[in-house]
Swiss-Prot record:
Gene: ELOVL1
GO terms of molecular function: fatty acid elongase activity
Name of the featured protein: Very long chain fatty acid elongase 1
Species annotation: Homo sapiens (Human)
Assigned EC number: 2.3.1.199
Tissue note: Ubiquitous.
Length: 279
């Protein structure tokens, strides 16, 4: 326990003071409590509450929710591009800019906004529970939805920006497509003729992980790179690689071996892809 406390204190010494005033960023206790409550609700409390109740329909809510996340994800992508990726970043070795320049502060804001969006997306699983779609609450889904915001919190706390933010930008780009699909599918059968591209959604996920891994792997082949926290590079590489393997396994068993769209790929009552988003 003493070692954990010492590690925590050491990490917090490197906290970026520019992020201190943002919601959830003062201490990891609040966000950890939220995530633990989420895990408890979706794995235990929620199913017990709904056990003897009829499933909620929630169609109107899901339409608004999904299209709101389309808009939010689009905005996040735009802000990442305008705060470095389309201006000063080289797309190779890009250290975090800790200055108070307008562009650097803009990057801090969008890094936090991406983190906050991960907490909003916890509602994905809550919707599953309220609609009694318990089969969609897989280990991969819950693991991803809980671990990503927890780990990203630490990244935003000490290194909001730089080459470590590439995967967040790519993830938000993918979410534009994903939530567009989910929003349309929430309309029911009337929208099904326009959702022919659902079969490509898992492939888009896999491409996302390939892009993230390729980008971050550049670090290992550079003669020098002054990115401030190499541990973040290592974690992103591990994250991209592990989830590529998990999604590949999912693809194999669902599409190649099974020759079918698995039940776990359905959201809003329509065929889709597993709600186990990346990054």
């Amino acid at each position: 326990m003493e070692a954990v406390v010492n590690l925590y204190q050491e990490v917090m010494k490197h906290a970026d003071p520019r992020i201190q005033g943002y919601p959830l960023m003062g201490s990891p206790l609040l966000m950890t409590s939220i995530l633990l409550t989420y895990v408890y609700f979706v794995l235990s409390l929620g199913p017990r509450i709904m056990a003897n109740r009829k499933p909620f329909q929630l169609r109107g809510f899901m339409i608004v929710y999904n299209f709101s996340l389309v808009a939010l994800s689009l905005y996040i992508v735009y802000e990442f591009l305008m705060s470095g990726w389309l201006s000063t970043y080289t797309w190779r070795c890009d250290p975090v800019d800790y200055s108070n320049s307008p562009e650097a502060l803009r990057m801090v804001r969008v890094a936090w906004l991406f983190l906050f969006s991960k907490f909003i997306e916890l509602m994905d699983t809550v919707i599953f529970i309220l609609r009694k779609k318990d089969g969609q609450v897989t280990f991969l889904h819950v693991f991803h939805h809980s671990v990503l915001p927890w780990s990203w919190w630490w990244g935003v706390k000490i290194a909001p920006g730089g080459m470590g933010s590439f995967h967040a930008m790519i993830n938000s780009s993918v979410h534009v497509i994903m939530y567009l699909y989910y929003g349309l599918s929430a309309f029911g059968p009337v929208a099904q003729p326009y959702l022919w591209w659902k079969k490509h959604m898992t492939a888009i996920q896999l491409i996302q992980f390939v892009l993230v891994s390729l980008h971050i792997s550049q670090y290992y082949f550079m003669s020098s790179c002054n990115y401030q926290y190499p541990v973040i590079i290592h974690l992103i590489w591990m994250y991209g690689t592990i989830f590529f393997m998990l999604f590949s396994n999912f693809w194999y068993h669902s599409y190649t071996k099974g020759k079918r769209l698995p039940r776990a790929l359905q959201q809003n009552g329509a065929p889709g892809i597993a709600k186990v988003k990346a990054n």
